[in-house]
């Protein structure tokens, strides 16, 4: 059974605090829109699909007990607030738009019913879509590379912790592993928040998938033995330009140089057809402390872990200026394919054409 980042049952919602992983499991109850805003903003929950799901379910949970004569305005204002938490991940904006349309189309108590149903459907749909992405992607990669066992490189975290379960890019890797087609998976540490070392490495170990953790800067030296690079996406523009975790662009350039397929995986929800290209993507910047500090359990004499004692350590000069973008944009011409639950999209004479 995969890790569960989002727990929703009987109108109660909680999320796994991913800032404490991999050493501590703690679920945070989400009882209000502000609770959801906080965990998304603080990256206690992250991953474009998971952000949208938590936002939608938080509004649904709050609707159960909210007392207001204007449910329509409550829903619209709630999603406007949640949209401010993370500006790059398109999934949140897509579900906010859909919920606005539902709120505008119904009256009174009907609004409460349809919004809750859509939030619950989103949770179930995401899990189904992830399994489809995994199957379509694994079939595509095996046919493209034409080897029985593959060595894969992935970046950031795109698994159960970033979605409702199974994952997108990591879903493809899971599907390959289920087919006995994984030789080894290399995952980058993914600075500055180390989602690769804290989360992806943890998921791979949890599923007993042969894996090795590397620093971000090691990628060039191992790229010649990589069969495919598989990453997720936070926003894909109409032309295929893809915003994803910072460092994705570097991997795409390396993959191009070494003639390694570079594959993007994500739900069709992540494709923003209103965005012509990646130049229009708003890139979120995080506080400099996320770059100049690290946090984790105390280790005595390099051997004894004190898991109950978590400390922050400053690893850079105190007054250094730090630039800490969360995402970069990979041009479409560096991407071999975009795998969604609808289809595997590859470039044609006119580039990427997303139609379903």
UniProtKB/Swiss-Prot annotation:
Principal EC category: isomerase
Keyword Cytoplasm: yes
InterPro entries associated with the record: IF-2B-related (IPR000649), IF-M1Pi (IPR005251), IF_2B-like_C (IPR042529), Initiation_fac_2B_a/b/d (IPR011559), M1Pi_N (IPR027363), NagB/RpiA_transferase-like (IPR037171)
Subcellular location: Cytoplasm; Nucleus
E.C. designation(s): 5.3.1.23
Site feature location: Transition state stabilizer: 156
Catalyzed reactions per annotation: 5-(methylsulfanyl)-alpha-D-ribose 1-phosphate = 5-(methylsulfanyl)-D-ribulose 1-phosphate
UniProt cross-references to HAMAP family, sorted A to Z: Salvage_MtnA
NCBIfam families cross-referenced by the UniProt entry: eIF-2B_rel (TIGR00524), PRK05720.1 (NF004326), salvage_mtnA (TIGR00512)
Protein name from the UniProt record: Methylthioribose-1-phosphate isomerase
Species in which this protein is naturally found: Schizosaccharomyces japonicus (strain yFS275 / FY16936) (Fission yeast)
